[in-house]
């Protein structure tokens, strides 16, 4: 009895141990996290891809910007999209923006294309005999705009004709800025001059001029990349921006090349903005963006004529022939009242940065290149150099401010050092009107902290482009995201490889500010936008390339457009390759068998999915991405190996496959072969037996020979006639004929097979019956065990509740009793006082 009791106790303890072990396993796996791959998450990083340009250029226009943009840019998108990114803060830095460098390179290409040299002017590097030119048909009216006679020189020189050993004398008009005296720069009485750049650089003449008016150019990011735009109205170009959107292309930017003043740019939306890389460093330029335009109207009133001088076969030098009428100076007019108001507002903004000093403006310091000392810009093909002293000397003039301008034809190219170009003159008078939208300033150095002096500057055209690109940055979309979830990849069957959904486009970034849990819900919509974006953009690029293939023959722009197209395809293939290696092709959410390591991030599941954005999460685990990628790849490799092993055992995956109807014919064929083999063996052995007996001298009379057989012991012997007793043995007849013999063998084989199969079925039935009976008994035992423990738990709970109720009731009674005693004591206080007083009186 004691042994049985111990056995029962051990069984009970064993059951309890199994139960607790199961609960422990469940609890241990409840919070276990696994790596999950997400495709289409709103994550990006800064990048420097090759941008392409878009413009509304007109192929029939001869204006050089139109000609350049026609074969350099694709058509603009008629329906540009801009997606707001809520709850997103992004850092911008206009001073370290690769878009500026790309635009700088592009505008250099534009100018090289526009001012393409046709003729080298090296033969003009000869002695020029020059005199002051007074013009023809001059009225000699002395006005403020009449040019000094020394401003334009009439020079004669010897030049080679079409026949190289022959020379002829020609004359041409040159501006004073384009020639230098041979006897020294300060010698104004000299009559011998040379071209200004003959000793420093090669001079080439541009092709005959056409109109020169910049058109807006949009810069666009290739598929797989996006352009982020800062929409803060007071953004100073550096630091965080809280109002961010994403666009495919920038706004139209006019590539105006100018110094000191910024022309035809964009305006600040609210107040004037001051931008500088380090405003306390006087070596850094200050870019001022105005909030209102100031119109500037420029003109060259002279009625010039143009003539050509032949310098040899196929070479012509274009120069000014005559100036009809008074030789009047080129000039620009600005409203003094509006300019002074603008300058005072700029002062107020500068005082916010230099609170202790007095802000003053002064003209540039003398000395240096004319491009820096004056406001240089291109007006209808002529290069104007205007003196801005009247703008920055703070005279307070409210009338029209007239800026005197000089024109140069030999230009130092701003895009290349040591290169000059001769710009042929434009016939007739020239007029152009522009809007001043900003200015470039420099601050004087020194220790004077009470007076801050600012002067106009410029020269580095990158600052011109920065004034327009300050609010943009290019980012590379990272569509693959990794995050921990409670889901684990369970299946081992091979997944069907679906077609991928394409590379990420800018459209889905609208969910960038959402939490990871909210953003993951829209993955399908995002991925579809990505695919449509890349397909549409690639189609536009290809259509533009096909339309312009005669202009894109191995040019830098054809290569750039093709590079942008190939870059998008490369991004797509790279992402799809990773998804394929991880076994996630065609999936937006893909679970893995890689457990999440808390060393990567120890945040809980709720903290990650309910409080963090994908960008914040990417920064959290960015250093471990390569490690996680490697683990996912190793896990997928192991899974594929397991799949291969499983496929090798696939024939034994299910016993029901043995009874498949498609295999019955194969079973029948095997059965017929076995029966035929048995019959053949029987015939062969019968023939061999007969042959053997014949060789021994025995010849059977018939196949019906009787074979004696013994009679059973319980059967009486038969009595023949005459009462003679027969032998105890009897004979049975053999079957007659070959077919009968075969049939008898087949019948015996079938009977044998039937008996064996019946015995096998009986054995299997008994085994199954015993197994089912045992299983049923086990289930009944488990059910009784569950009922027993349920009843025990119920009784324990009831007992616990009863005990708790009794304890609570006892405690309540005690509390009530204590309260009653305290109440009675309070009620008896007056009586006790009275009794005490009575005793004291007695």
UniProtKB/Swiss-Prot annotation:
Residues 364-375 are annotated as: CD4-binding loop. One of its GO terms (biological process) is viral protein processing. Residues 619-653 form a coiled coil. One of its GO terms (molecular function) is structural molecule activity. Residues 130-154 are annotated as: V1. A motif (Di-leucine internalization motif) lies at residues 841-842. Belongs to the HIV-1 env protein family. This is Envelope glycoprotein gp160. It comes from Human immunodeficiency virus type 1 group M subtype K (isolate 96CM-MP535) (HIV-1).
């Amino acid at each position: 009895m004691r042994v049985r009791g111990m056995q029962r106790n051990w069984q009970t303890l064993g059951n309890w141990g199994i139960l607790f072990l199961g609960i422990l396993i469940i609890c241990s796996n409840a919070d276990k996290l696994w790596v999950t791959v997400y495709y289409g998450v709103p994550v990006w990083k800064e990048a420097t891809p090759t941008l392409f340009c878009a413009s509304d250029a007109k192929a029939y226009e001869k204006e050089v910007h139109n000609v350049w943009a026609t074969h350099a840019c694709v058509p603009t998108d008629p329906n540009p999209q801009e997606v707001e990114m809520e709850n997103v803060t992004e850092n911008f830095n206009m001073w370290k923006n690769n878009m500026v460098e790309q635009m700088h390179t592009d505008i250099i290409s534009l100018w090289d294309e526009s001012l393409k040299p046709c003729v080298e002017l090296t033969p003009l590097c000869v002695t020029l005999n020059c005199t002051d030119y007074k013009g023809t048909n001059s009225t000699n009216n002395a006005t403020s705009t009449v040019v000094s006679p020394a401003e334009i020189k009439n020079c004669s020189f010897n030049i080679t004709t079409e026949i190289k050993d022959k020379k002829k004398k020609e004359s041409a008009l040159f501006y004073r800025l384009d020639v230098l005296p041979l006897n020294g720069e300060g010698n104004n009485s000299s009559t011998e001059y040379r071209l200004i750049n003959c000793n420093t650089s090669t001079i080439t003449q541009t092709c005959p001029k056409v109109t020169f008016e910049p058109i807006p150019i949009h810069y666009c990011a290739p598929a797989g990349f996006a352009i982020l735009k800062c929409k803060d109205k007071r953004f100073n170009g550096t630091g965080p921006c809280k109002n961010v959107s994403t666009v495919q292309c920038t706004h139209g930017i006019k590539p105006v090349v100018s110094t000191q003043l910024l022309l035809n740019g964009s305006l600040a939306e609210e107040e004037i903005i001051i931008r500088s890389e380090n405003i306390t460093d006087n070596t850094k330029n200050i870019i001022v963006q105005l909030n209102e335009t100031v119109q500037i109207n420029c003109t060259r009133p002279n009625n010039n004529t143009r003539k050509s001088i032949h310098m040899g076969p196929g070479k012509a030098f274009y120069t000014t022939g005559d100036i009809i009428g008074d030789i009047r100076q080129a000039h620009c007019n600005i409203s003094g009242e509006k300019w002074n108001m603008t300058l005072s507002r700029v002062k107020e903004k500068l005082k916010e940065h230099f609170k202790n000093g007095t802000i003053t403006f002064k003209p540039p310091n003398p000395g240096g290149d004319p491009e820096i000392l004056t406001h240089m810009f291109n007006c209808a093909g002529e290069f104007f150099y205007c003196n801005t002293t009247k703008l920055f000397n703070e005279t307070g003039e409210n009338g029209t401010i007239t800026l005197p301008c000089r024109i140069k034809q030999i230009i130092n190219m701003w895009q290349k050092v040591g290169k000059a170009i001769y710009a042929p003159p434009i016939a007739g008078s020239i007029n152009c009107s522009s809007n001043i939208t900003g200015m470039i300033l420099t601050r004087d150095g020194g220790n004077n902290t009470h007076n801050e002096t600012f002067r106009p500057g410029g020269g580095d055209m990158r600052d011109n482009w920065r004034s327009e690109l300050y609010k943009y940055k290019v980012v590379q979309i990272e569509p693959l995201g990794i995050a921990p979830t409670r889901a684990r990849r369970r299946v081992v069957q091979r997944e069907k490889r679906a077609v991928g959904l394409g590379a990420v486009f800018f459209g889905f970034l609208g969910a960038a500010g959402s939490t990871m849990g909210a953003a993951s819900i829209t993955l399908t919509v995002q991925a579809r936008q990505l695919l449509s974006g890349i397909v549409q953009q690639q189609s536009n690029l290809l259509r533009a390339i096909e339309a312009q293939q005669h202009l894109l023959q191995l040019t830098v722009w054809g290569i750039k457009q093709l590079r942008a197209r190939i870059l998008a395809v490369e991004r797509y293939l790279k992402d799809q390759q990773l998804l394929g290696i991880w076994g996630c092709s065609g999936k937006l959410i893909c679970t893995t068998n890689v457990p999440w390591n808390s060393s990567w991030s120890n945040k809980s599941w709720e903290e990650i999915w309910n409080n963090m954005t994908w960008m914040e999460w990417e920064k959290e685990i960015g250093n471990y991405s390569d490690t996680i990628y490697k683990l996912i790849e190793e896990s997928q490799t192991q899974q594929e190996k397991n799949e291969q092993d499983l496929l090798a055992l696939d024939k034994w995956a299910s016993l029901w496959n043995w009874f498949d109807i498609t295999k019955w014919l194969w079973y029948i064929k095997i059965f017929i072969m076995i029966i035929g083999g048995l019959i053949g063996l029987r015939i062969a052995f019968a023939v061999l037996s007969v042959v053997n007996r014949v060789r021994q001298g025995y010849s059977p009379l018939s196949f019906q020979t009787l074979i004696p057989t013994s009679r059973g012991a319980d059967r009486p012997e038969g009595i023949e006639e005459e009462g003679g007793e027969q032998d105890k043995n009897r004979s049975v007849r053999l079957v007659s004929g070959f077919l009968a013999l075969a049939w008898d063998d087949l019948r015996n084989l079938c009977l044998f097979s039937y008996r064996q199969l019946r015995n096998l079925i009986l054995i299997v039935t008994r085994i199954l019956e015993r197994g089912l009976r045992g299983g049923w008994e086990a289930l009944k035992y488990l059910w009784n065990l569950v009922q027993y423990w349920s009843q025990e738990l119920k009784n324990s709970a009831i007992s616990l509740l009863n005990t708790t109720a009794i304890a609570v009731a006892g405690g309540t009674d005690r509390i009530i009793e204590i309260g009653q005693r305290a109440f009675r004591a309070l009620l008896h206080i007056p009586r006790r006082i009275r009794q005490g007083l009575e005793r004291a009186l007695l």
